[in-house]
Structure formats: structure tokens, C-alpha cells
Amino acid sequence: MAADDDNGDGTSLFDVFSASPLKNNDEGSLDIYAGLDSAVSDSASKSCVPSRNCLDLYEEILTEEGTAKEATYNDLQVEYGKCQLQMKELMKKFKEIQTQNFSLINENQSLKKNISALIKTARVEINRKDEEISNLHQRLSEFPHFRNNHKTARTFDTVKTKDLKSRSPHLDDCSKTDHRAKSDVSKDVHHSTSLPNLEKEGKPHSDKRSTSHLPTSVEKHCTNGVWSRSHYQVGEGSSNEDSRRGRKDIRHSQFNRGTERVRKDLSTGCGDGEPRILEASQRLQGHPEKYGKGEPKTESKSSKFKSNSDSDYKGERINSSWEKETPGERSHSRVDSQSDKKLERQSERSQNINRKEVKSQDKEERKVDQKPKSVVKDQDHWRRSERASLPHSKNEITFSHNSSKYHLEERRGWEDCKRDKSVNSHSFQDGRCPSSLSNSRTHKNIDSKEVDAMHQWENTPLKAERHRTEDKRKREQESKEENRHIRNEKRVPTEHLQKTNKETKKTTTDLKKQNEPKTDKGEVLDNGVSEGADNKELAMKAESGPNETKNKDLKLSFMKKLNLTLSPAKKQPVSQDNQHKITDIPKSSGVCDSESSMQVKTVAYVPSISEHILGEAAVSEHTMGETKSTLLEPKVALLAVTEPRIGISETNKEDENSLLVRSVDNTMHCEEPICGTETSFPSPMEIQQTESLFPSTGMKQTINNGRAAAPVVMDVLQTDVSQNFGLELDTKRNDNSDYCGISEGMEMKVALSTTVSETTESILQPSIEEADILPIMLSEDNNPKFEPSVIVTPLVESKSCHLEPCLPKETLDSSLQQTELMDHRMATGETNSVYHDDDNSVLSIDLNHLRPIPEAISPLNSPVRPVAKVLRNESPPQVPVYNNSHKDVFLPNSAHSTSKSQSDLNKENQKPIYKSDKCTEADTCKNSPLDELEEGEIRSDSETSKPQESFEKNSKRRVSADVRKSKTIPRRGKSTVCLDKDSRKTHVRIHQTNNKWNKRPDKSSRSSKTEKKDKVMSTSSLEKIVPIIAVPSSEQEIMHMLRMIRKHVRKNYMKFKAKFSLIQFHRIIESAILSFTSLIKHLNLHKISKSVTTLQKNLCDIIESKLKQVKKNGIVDRLFEQQLPDMKKKLWKFVDDQLDYLFAKLKKILVCDSKSFGRDSDEGKLEKTSKQNAQYSNSQKRSVDNSNRELLKEKLSKSEDPVHYKSLVGCKKSEENYQDQNNSSINTVKHDIKKNFNICFDNIKNSQSEERSLEVHCPSTPKSEKNEGSSIEDAQTSQHATLKPERSFEILTEQQASSLTFNLVSDAQMGEIFKSLLQGSDLLDSSVNCTEKSEWELKTPEKQLLETLKCESIPACTTEELVSGVASPCPKMISDDNWSLLSSEKGPSLSSGLSLPVHPDVLDESCMFEVSTNLPLSKDNVCSVEKSKPCVSSILLEDLAVSLTVPSPLKSDGHLSFLKPDMSSSSTPEEVISAHFSEDALLEEEDASEQDIHLALESDNSSSKSSCSSSWTSRSVAPGFQYHPNLPMHAVIMEKSNDHFIVKIRRATPSTSSGLKQSMMPDELLTSLPRHGKEADEGPEKEYISCQNTVFKSVEELENSNKNVDGSKSTHEEQSSMIQTQVPDIYEFLKDASDKMGHSDEVADECFKLHQVWETKVPESIEELPSMEEISHSVGEHLPNTYVDLTKDPVTETKNLGEFIEVTVLHIDQLGCSGGNLNQSAQILDNSLQADTVGAFIDLTQDASSEAKSEGNHPALAVEDLGCGVIQVDEDNCKEEKAQVANRPLKCIVEETYIDLTTESPSSCEVKKDELKSEPGSNCDNSELPGTLHNSHKKRRNISDLNHPHKKQRKETDLTNKEKTKKPTQDSCENTEAHQKKASKKKAPPVTKDPSSLKATPGIKDSSAALATSTSLSAKNVIKKKGEIIILWTRNDDREILLECQKRGPSFKTFAYLAAKLDKNPNQVSERFQQLMKLFEKSKCR
């Protein structure tokens, strides 16, 4: 019927219906016939109208048909209606999906915009480089004509020879001659580079080269122009320089594409200047660019230079494409091209050598001109062919080329910078340029030559095979001819080479001199170090590179960001080519490519050069290139070189650093290609390369296979080079620590350390006997550097697997050594695991190459992503942490030394740190390959060097036990080992290094253990879940196994579908109970406890009872009843929290038990463990436990040292466990930061000693001993974080550490990370521990337990531990975990650099509440702690501006999930949390408006710059509040997008609040918070007012800084926590202050006045404010400003509360504040405060309230702060909330205050004042307040938003609106409550709202407090997507929403009305309301 209807029966149907139905109707009432007529007529269409009789029947039929049709039609209509409804529903869904799609599209587009910006940048770079290349090609194409015009070339040669003659006699004339040559060249070569030439001419080569090396330029000129040797070298050196300069210039060109030509001209000019005499020929060789355009010689040189630079660029490009080729292809093509190139280079070298002789120079110049012409032609053809053949990959190539060039340039630039410091000793890879300038240029040229040649040869198969046939044939013919000449020349040069060898020896000194004098000495250096000089020049090039490179770095860093997948391969191409050449043609590769003609001589020469600087870098390349022939020599030379290097180390340090960086970078870049290359020279590089290449390990393997012949040489070189690199690394580390800023230093260190550590480690590995020594050196020196090596470690891990297969061909030992070295690097690198993990994953972002990266740490840069993968291995994160701790000892070795050091440590568990470092270095290095083979577990390779094997065996067993814990975290294990600076820590290392062993030995030991009880799983089944350590020696091992089971349980749970039954859940929990209890029962705990059965029973009972509670639980039942879509996630979150709590409880029991047990004989047990191999793992555990107990005992006896050790041990254990879980990433972050600190501080040992002094405040201790601090942090973290880190913080933390992460992180992770960031924990450190903070901030009773336990549950341990500042494991577990985790994160990173006792308050805002008992002690220590802390904290304090690009789960609301109140509140007091949240809000609001983030494309230079160690160190020394890291540091959310946050962690202000102030903070803050807060606000701006007013001053300072930045958030949080902790003291202090004032009321009044005064002083700027009411309002608003102005007085005032009050009174008088209003508000506040004051705070609150009353609005805040005990940092907000606190629960108010303060202290202050005034009945102030608020807000915003007028305006508007709303809010408590909710939810924007609402409605206090808390949690005021403000919510908006919803109810009409009013989408409004309500509810829950 439907078909009929549709088909047109529709009409007939309707006809029927119109006719037949009518008849049906008629039939009933009419005659059939009567109807029949009509029926016949109507239905005539259907019925033929037969006979009438028939018609009757027909009519019936018709009616039946009609009715049937009607029925079917009706049915169809019903169906149609249903379908319509369905359509409507679907359309609704569609629209919803469309809206979602739209939002997603918007997000995507914002992402695309960012990415496109990056891509555009990359394309611009690519285009620029293409243009450069095309220009070079044009020149080259021009050069062929010039080549043909040999007359012209010869003419130029004659000119050049004339120049040479004139210049050779005069070094000084070199520059002149260079200029002449330049002018000549510019005339001849003017081409398009006339401007660049002019520039070059204008800038003599010295100038140009003087970028990094002025002397070098002169030296090079002199060297090249004057000396035959220099000429000789200059041939190469010039080309190298040219290529290097070309690259430098490329960097320049990156900035200035015109500079490209300038660069070319620079290189040409430089080449001209250097070898002016030689340059005719050399330029033809090395600087074709320079001469190519003007004259034949220029032509040939410029053509060659073009070919060099072109091949450099193109070579790089080709290199990238070549890298893309299979290694075999590369090796073959490389071999072919290299063989050709060898000839060429040999001829060139011989020519260069001959050129050294002016006579031979001219000839050779012509020859070289001819040859370079042919070469250039070949290269041109080759490049053209390459371009032609690789056009598709051209962008890629260009990109990789850019990146490689960028990396090279980066390296070179960085090296150049170092070279500026010490240019001489760097003969980088090519080491051909005699003078450093020529080196840099020659390096470029040689690099380009070699790379080009390599590319030509490598790409020759691609393009070269096409054009190569022609070009190569020509080139080969020419090269053969040249080679003949060269050979003839070589015969002469052989002498030269011998001379060169001798001279190279001289060159070491000469090079130094040359680099330093860079003039006359270049002569000898040139001859002797033609290659060495080239290397130097390369290094110089690298050095000069940084100038351009850093410029280029931005783009390249962006490129790298874009290149995230480009991976070092593309960055590596140039160096890779060199190294590949080295590998494939050991002689021709590396330096040999350029020196191939000199190969034979180079063999002899290389050794000598190797001995010299070449030995450092050139040897690496020379030996690499000539590894086979000169392998032994270079090895000896390298060994010799290491010594000279040490001599040269100062200069070499930088030079070598640059060289190393370059070579390492090259290796890193070449890591894929060098894989094989590593076989010969690059073994160190190989490690690096393999690491960076790790993803391309297959390639590496192929390369290795292709270069199987080279392995021996590579091993030798590996050892030598590694050693050299190690030395270089040592120097470089020093340089890094000194030279690099924190971010820059960190990144550079990461890059350098990684590469260096790799090289050093590979060196160490090959020369294992030396490895112990070198590793120690490296470990000590490298450790600071080896932060970066963290990255390497993960790479090594994966690499080791591949390397083993490939490297074993060479030498299993060497490969193992390499791997171990890599492991070392990994261990060290793991510190920077973030970075090098990125290298691993984001190989394209070679931090080594990204030397300038410090500028940009952004999601774009996210090197971390790849790291995340490695991090997943879990080893890198922990290693870095521990590496930090053991930076000196283990960093390089940590991964490798883990097993070794573990064995050593196990043997001497407490004292083998150094020994184990050495041993573990070598041992770990050996073990690392196998260990790293398995990502989850570090297999300590018995294959590792045999000397280490014994250790490893011992450590294996130990590790077997430990590994089970750290098994999943081999890197962590290593880091643990590193952590085990104390012998105890070593066991962790060992156990993790021996993860694989653990699996095996552990299995045996496990199997030895049989089931003990009936209700237990079989050991075999258990072992399937977890490697059982039958006789665990430490609580950590037990916890590790438990965590493994927990992971297994989670794994099983996650196998469930989204919906599953309660029975299934019960089964999972039951299986978990069985697994846990079975494990406990299987374990032999005799090493941990005396009463094993009792302990087991207790543990099993706790597990069963807790898990049964989890099984049968109302929450679980409700979750199953609700069957929410995310039930599974929520349920597991609940289970996870419970398990966290359970684990913490178990750990407490184990720790306490092991403490008592461990006191017996830690040393003896440790010794036993070291003695007993079988018992090693157990012994180690025991020794760890013993050391823990011992530490605890010591701690008890000497609270400091014992605490330190205990906490270290406990931390180590917990770290170990936590590492095993996911702490590794957190630790890595911490350690990265710590390493930075350490690098800056290099106070590990000092910090250790200091650490003991700090041990009482062990969490603080982290600063003193990064290792121990890290251990403590880790322990704390691991205890709680071990539980929670499992969740997923590991990745995030590590990502945070790396600052760049695109790794997917869970919302919880993101939230944790960000929460920690926003909460002000040391953002990087706390990124680790902050997450951990959240992690250990157990949402479960643990928080309370922690608080109670720290004092009561674990009186002995906890009290001591609390006293020790969470030093002991127990307190760590309990209270320490809560605050000490944060503190350890914060404190350790801060204090790690400083070895001073860190006050818990100082250490950790989160742990502040825990420190209350320790406050008295802490107070005393606070000053010292703060003093010691400043350096460490300075990193963050100092505008560390670490741009953390945290992948944010926030999609629109993500911040809600990401700022989970439960997470942050779990461990920290609500007040602290509110402080965090308020800081968060401030961050968010100010961030959105003030801190307009400039996308990370340009990474935050300020952050990297300000994070320079020197900068933040000096800053940390800032007077007064050295504890600033927490207070002043704030994470400024530079960019908030759905994907990520770019958080800049910067110091809020150099707030000077000192420890005294902090200690005073609780009471003083509470009572005098208004005063001190304002003072503090003023203080920071005017001066750091005395530290005595620490908290409030610092709070205000923070507020100022918050206003300026969002740093005050952390400050607020910290201060809040501190306030809580310090409340008694502060209370007393406040009482004292109040007494000083006469009485608390007077004090309060005076404080109020003071606040007013402060405000008034702010009004001083805002004198327009007529009345004191206005002033008081404005004071609150202006507090930021006020405290600025008042700071003069406040400094005094902060010193003396009485003085402060007096000053305040004076200010009040000056302001002429309306005393009545102030008094009224004060009274009101006083009443409310007194009534609402909380607990002990009540007294303080009363005092504070009176003070606050005297302050006016602030008194309420003061009361609130007092009541909260967390006087939250923002004075204004605190005051606001204090006033509100009087009316409402202080905590709520405090939270609100935080939010308000965070958002806008001025606004909140204004609001508060408004509310206060309105409360007192001064409503007139409300009307005035808006203006005042605007003024103060303006001021505050002006302070913070000077650069953000829009934000100011918006905030002003918000303030006005808020003020307007405030009156209504005051009118209705509900409204105020809504405002409070709004404010709290808005965190930043609603600040004003919250205070007003709070004040207006005491009842709302809770909600407002909750809102405040939730504000920090979620409601984003500014929703940005990729930097674009999509939605902007102001406090006024929130207030309107809340008020309207209160009045009208949350209906759609209300939302529509609000949407119209607010100009928003109703959906947005409703969403915002929901967010605010969520926040409000969350805050309520809190």
C-alpha cells in the first residue's frame, strides 16, 4: 500500500478515500445505488463500471478496498509519524553531534592553526633553504662556466695567490686580504650575495667568524691565508668553514634569508678571509660560493663551496633522505660515494696539505679549482639530480635538512658559544679547519662536503646514480687526477701529515692558542691540525652556529616541533652522513671524507690529531673515518687526546662540548645512520644515535650490519671517542651547568648529556677498565650534564636491543658496553628522560641539536612525546630522579651502573655510591644493553664486561628481588640505583638494572618459596603476575610486588566491558585479595621483620578488610545502580583510591616494622648482602631496609642525618616502588629539575652533607641531596605516588618534565600535573611530585590518617619523620607523603641544589598542613631552609618560566576534570587546596587575560632565559623569602587549549618574605594577614619586606606576582599550608603583634588601617579614591598596588607588626580612610570572625579579625585566613575571605579567598571591602567600590597585565560588574552565595564575587569556599583553544548566572535570558552554570 500510495495509487487511494470512503459513509445512511452513481463516477478510474449489479459488488469491493487502504494508510501515517519523531530525535542528535563537531572542528582548527603556523614556519624554512640551495645551485651552475673558464679561475688564482703571498706573510693582513679577497670575491662573486659579501666585507672574516670567534676568524684568515698548512687545511678547513659558515649563515638566513647569501658570502668571505691565498684554491674547494660568481677560482671555490654548502644543505637534505634510505643502501651508496669522495677528499686534503704550502697551494688551488669545479659540478648535478630524484622528499629532505642543519647549527651555535669561550680545542667531527673560524666554516663546508659527498654518494644511488654517472665520472676522473696530484702532493704532504701529526700534537695547544689567539697559532694548528683545525672549525662552526643556530633554533626548534616525527635522523643527516661515511668508509667517513686523500696520512695524522683536539672531535670523525686503518692509533690518540683534552678541557670543554655536542649531535642525528657508524667511531655516537635513532633501530641495525667490518674499529674508537666525549662531557657538563640556563642548560645538558653521556658511556663501555674511572668522571661531571642523558637512556634501552644484535657483530662487549654506556646515558639521560625520551620518540627533536631549545619548550617542541614511550618503559623517569640525586656518581652510570652500583651498593649498601657509580657505570653499561633490551625490566647483562659481571651477578640477584618491583621500570631501577647515592639506594639501582635477572633469579628464588597457607595462589600462578622475590629485603620490594599485582588486577579489571556486573567486580576484588594475601604469605619477611607471621597476618588482615570494604561498599553499589556510562572508570577510580590508601597503610606497616627490624644491623646486613650473591637481592633489600632502619635510628639519634638516611632509604624504597609504578616519570621530572639545580649547584655532595642538616626536614632535604632529596621525594611520592603514580602520572610527569608532551595522558594525570603546576609546587619538580602530591594526596581517609598518623599513628617514626621533615619513610608514607611528597618535589628540587635544612613549610605547600607539629623546628630551620632553598627554588622562582606544555584533557570543561578537587585536596588541607585553587584561578584568569600566551612556536625564551641557573640562582638568593619557590613561583598558563596547557612556571615576584614571615605566617598571616599580606604585597613590589612577615609578605608578594604572573598560586598554596602548619606560632606571633599593637582589637584596627593604608597607598596611585571607604575598598583592590607603594613602610612594618600597624595607621591617616566604615567593617568582621573562627585559629582569628577589622575588609580576610589556618597568599582575597570567614566557615572562605585572590586580589579585595562595607552598612562604598575595584584591579592588573590592557579592561569591567553585583549580592545572601559559587568556580574572575557573596552571606561561606576550591578545580574563566579565546567568563558573568539561577531557577528561560544579557550562547551559559555548580559541590565536598 505504501508503495501504491507512493506510486500514484496515492492519488487513486485518495480518490478511493474521497469516493469510496464517502460511499462507505453513504452506505450507512444512503442507498447503495445513490452512492453507486457517485461511486461509479468517482471510482470510474478504477472500475470499468460494468453492469449495475456488478457495480453493487464493485462498490463493496471498493469500500472494502478503501477501508483496507485507509487502514494501511493510517498505519503508514502512524509509522510516518513515528519516523518523523525518530527523525526529530535523530536531528536533535545530529544537531548535538554537529555542535560537538563544531566545537571539535573549532578545536581542530585552532590546532590546525597552531600546527599550520608551525608548518608554515617549517615551510618558510624549507623554502628558505630551498632558495638557498637553489642559489647555491645557481652559483654552482654559474661555477661550471667559471670552471670552464679556467682562465678566470686562474686569474682569480693568481689574484688569490697574490693575496696568499701578501697574506701569508701577514696574519693580520689575512683579514685585510680576506677583505680584499672578499672585495675581489664580492666583485667576482658578487652574484646575488653582493649584500652578504658586502656584509662579509664589512664584517671581516674575523667579524663574521667572530660571531663566535673573532680571533678565530683572524686566525683562520691567517691560518688559511698565511700558512701552507693552514692552506692545506683551509682547503678542507675553508670548505668546512664554508659549509659550517654556510650552515651558520643558514642559521642567519633562517633569521634573514638575505642572510643566506650573507652567510654564503660569510662563508665565502670567511673563506676568502681565511685562505685568501689558499682560498683561491681552497675556495674553489671549500668556498666556491665565495669565488664562484666573480672568477673561475671564485667560481670553482664558490662552486665548490656551493657544492659544499649546497651539498651541506642538500647533503643534509639528502642526508635526511639518505637516512630514509635503508642503511644498507646508505652504506653502499655511502661506500660508493665515499670511495669517490674519499678520492676527492684525499685529493682535496692533499691539495689542502699542499695548500698549506703556498706554492702547492696555487697549484692545488687550480687543481682544486678544477676538481672542486668538477666536484661542484658533480655536486651540482648530484644535487640537481638529487633534487630531481628526491623532489618528493625535498620538503622532507629540506625539513630534515633544516632540522639536521638546524641541529648541526644548533650544536655549532651552541658549540660556537662555547667556542667563544674556548674555540681551540674543538676539532669537531671534521676537525679539518685549522682555525676555529675556518673550523666552523670548514666544518660546515666539510660537513657539507662530507655530508654532501655522503649525500652525493648516499644519494648518488638515488640521484647520483643518475647524474652521478656524469658528475661522478667527471668528479672521479678529476678526483683521480687530483688524487694523483694529491698522492704526489700527499707524498709531500705525507711529510706534512707527519708534520701534521706532530703539529696536531702541537695543535692541541696550538688549537687552544689558535682558538684563543685565533691568529698566529693557526699556522701550526693549520698544518698540524688541518683536520684538527677542521674539526675545530667545525666546532667553531658549531660555535658560530649558535648565533645563527639559536636564531635558527627557534625556527628549527619549531621545525623540530613540527618534525616531531622528523626525529634526529633529519637532524642528524649531516653528522650522520659524516658518521656514516666514517662507518662505511671508516677512513673516508667522518673527517676522512674530507681527508680521504689524506687517509693514509690521516691515519698517522688522525692519531696525532686524535691526541689533540682532533682526538677529541676530529679523531672521533677521523678515527671514525679511518677507524679501520687508524683505529688503534686513534684509540691511542684518543686516549692521549683525552689527556690533552683534559688539558684543553677548559677550552676543549666548550669546544669539545660543541664538538661533542656536534659529534654527539651528529651521532644523535646520525644515530640511525651511525648505528653502523657507531660500529667504528660513533659507538659513542652510535649509542646516542641509536638512542635518538631508537625508533629507527632497525635502520641502525642495518647500518651495523653493513658496517660489521667497522665494529672493532668502532669499539676502539668507541672507547676512545667515548672517553673523549666523556672528558668533553665532563667539561661540557661543567659548561652546561655553568653555561646553560635551567631550561637551556637543562635542554642543552639533556642534549649534550645525552650525546655526551652516550659517547662517554660508549667510551666507558668499550674501555671498561677505564669505564670505571671515566664513568665516575662522567658520572660526576656528566651527571649534571646527564640530565639530558636521561633521554639517551630510554633510547639506549630500545637501542640496546637493536644495538646488541648489530653491535654484537662488532664486539658483544663493546656493544654491551655501548649499550651500558647508553644505559649510563639512559640513567643519566633518564634524568632528562623527558628530553631524550623525546629523542627516542621524537627523534627529530634532538635536544642535542635543539641546543637553543631552552627557548622553546612547548607541545610543538614536545620532545617528550617519544620520551613518553620510553617513559612507559618506566626506567628513564626514575633514573633521572635518581640521576639527579646521584648526578655526580651515577648519572652517567645510573642506568648501567645500576646493576654494577647495585652490586657494589649491595655489597656496601650504604657506602658504595661512588664505587657503585664507577662499577655500576661500567657494569650498568654492560648490563644496560640487555637490561634495556627488555623495556619493562633492565636486564643486567652478564654479557657486560666480566669485571662488572660479578657485581652484576650480585646485583642481579638483588635486582631480581628489586627488579620485581622495578621490573617494569628498568630505567627507574637505574634511577633508583642512582638514587642510591647512599648504598641503600644502590640496591634499587641494581635491582632495576637487573630486572631481567630478577625475573630469572627471582623466579628461582620465588619457586624456592612454596605456598605457605591454604588460601593462597600457587607460587607459579603468582609468578605469572609478578616476579616474586621470595625473601624481600625491603619494604619497597614487597610494595613493588604488590603494585605489580595491583597492576595485574587493574589489567584484569580493564578487560571488562564498559558495563559489567557487580559479581564480576566482586570476583576481581576477591582475586585481588587472594593475590595480595598469597603474595604476602609467600614472602619470607624475615629480613624485614622479626615477627614474620605477625607481620604477614597484619598485612593480610589489612588487605582483606580493606578490599572487602571495597567489595561491599555503598559507593560501589550506587555506581552499579546508576550504571553511568563512565561507571567503569569511576569505579576503578574509587578502587584505585582505596588501593592507594591500602598500599600506603601497608607501606607504613612495613616501614615501621622494617625500621625496628632494620635498626639491628644495617651495615652488617648490607655487608652480608654484598658478601652473599644469592642473598644479594635479599641483602640488598635488607640493607635498604636496614639502611632505612639505620637511617631511622640515626634519624632518631641524630634527627638530621638519620632522618636523611631514613627518608632516603624510605624514599628510595618508595621511589623504587614508585618508580616501579610510575614514579619514574615523576622522578624523572623531579630529577631533571633537580639536575638542573644540581648542575647549577653541583652541590650533590655538599647537599648530601647539608642534607643531613636538612634531614630533619628530609622532604626539604631534596635540595641538599638531589639523590637523597629525590629519594625522599620519590619515597614520599612512591609511597603515595607509588600507589597513585600507577594511575598514570608517570607519563604526565615525565611529559611535564620534558615540558613537551603530546603523549596521551588521562584527565587525572593531566589534572594532577596541572594541579601540581597550578598549586605552586615546584612546577617541574612538583610536576613529578605534584602529580605525586595528588597521587599521594589520597582522597581516602589517608589524608586524615596522614595528618593523624604523622603525629599519632606512627609516633616514633612519624614524629621523628615529621620532625625530620618527612625524612623517614614512615612519615613519608603518612604525613610526609602528603606534604613531603610535594615538599620533596618542591623542596628537593629547590633544596637539592641547596644543601640546607628545608623547613617543611618552605618545602611544601601541600605538606604544610603536615608540618604544623614541626613548625617550631621548622621555624628555626625555615630561615636556613629558605636561605638554602633559594637557589633551588630559584629555578622555579626565577621565572623558570618552564613552558610546560601539558596535554590537557580539558575539553572545554576539561579543567574540571583536570583540577580535581579530590586529588588536590586529598593530601593537602582544604585551605591549602583552596590556596592552590585560588592560585589556579589566578593563573587561569590572569593567564587568560594577562598572560596572553604566545604560542610555543616561539618557545618561551623568557622561561629558558630566566631559568638560567645563574639567573634563578641569583634570584633564589633574593632577600627574605627564599622559600619563594612555592610562593612566588606560579605556573602561568601561557596557553590553555583543549589539547594542552602551556604553563610557564615563573616566579610570581622576587617576594622577599623570609622564613620568619613564613613561620609567622599562620598566626601572623591569620591575624596580621591583612597587614602582612598588604605589606607582603607592597614588600615584593617595593622591596622584599623583611622575611619575618614571610608568609603574608610573601603572600602579598605572591599576590603581586600573581597579579603580575600567577606565581602567587603556589605561594598561596604554600603559604596556606604553611599557615596551617605554623598557625600556633603565627598565632602567637600575631598575638605578640597584637600585644605589641596594644590589643588584638587595636592590632586588628591598625591592621585594618594598615590594610587601608596599603590600599590607600595603592590608592596613592589611586589617590583619586576620595574616601577611606573607597580607599579601603580600593585597598583591598589595590593591595597589590598598595603593598607595592606601602612596601617602603611595610618593609619596616613587616619587620615589626607594631611598626607595620603604625605605618598602616599612618597610611590610613594619610589616606584619610573613613575610620567609621573601616571600623564598621572591622567590627562586623570581628563579630563574624570571632563567631566563625575555626579552632585554634579562632583566637588567631579573633586577633586577626580585630586586625582585619582595623584593616577594614581585610580584617575579615585576616580572620578568614586565620580561621582557615591557610591564610591564603592573596592578601586581598584572604582578607576578603577572612571577613567572610567571620560570617562563614573559615575553610570555605579561605578557599574562596584563594580563588578570589588568585583571580584578582584587587577585585576580591574590592569586593570584600564592598561586602564588608555593605555589611557595616557602608553601601556607598559599594558604589564607589566599582571604581575603586577598577582602580585597584587596574593597578594589580597593571602590575601583572601591563602588557595586557584588554585583560585589564576586562577585569576592570568585571570588577565594575562585580561591584554592581556585589550590592545585590550583599542584598541577598543567596545571591552572594551564588556569587561565591560563581567566584569560586571562576576562581580567578569571581574573586570579587566570592568575597562579596561571602561577606554578604555567612551561610554562603561554605559554598563560596567550596566554590573557591572548585574554582581552582574547574570553571575556566577563559576557555582558550590554541591561544584563541573562545569563551571568556568573568566574575560578573558568573555572578549574573548564579544570581539569576537563584532567582529564577536554572531553567532554559533563565539561561536564555542570561545568554542574551551576557552575549553568550544559552548552552554555554547552562554549561557554565553546571560547571560552577560542580565546582561548588566539589568545594562543598571538600
UniProtKB/Swiss-Prot annotation:
Protein keywords = Acetylation, Activator, Apoptosis, Cell cycle, Cytoplasm, Mitochondrion, Nucleus, Phosphoprotein, Repressor, Transcription, Transcription regulation
Q: Where is the composition biased (Basic and acidic residues)?
A: 159-191, 198-210, 286-395, 406-423, 444-455, 463-524, 905-924, 936-965, 999-1016, 1157-1170, 1851-1865
Q: Motif SUMO interaction motif 2 (SIM): which residue numbers?
A: 1737-1741
Q: Which InterPro entries match?
A: FLASH, Gon4l/CASP8AP2_myb-like, Homeodomain-like_sf
Single GO MF descriptor = death receptor binding
Q: What induces it?
A: By TNF which induces strong nuclear localization.
Q: Where is the composition biased (Polar residues)?
A: 225-240, 396-405, 894-904, 1171-1181, 1269-1281
N6-acetyllysine modified-residue sites? K1343
Under Pfam families, the record lists: Myb_DNA-binding_7
As annotated in the record, motif SUMO interaction motif 3 (SIM) runs over 1794-1798
Please give a single GO biological process term from the UniProt record.
apoptotic signaling pathway
Q: What is this protein called?
A: CASP8-associated protein 2
According to its UniProt entry, this protein's organism is Homo sapiens (Human)
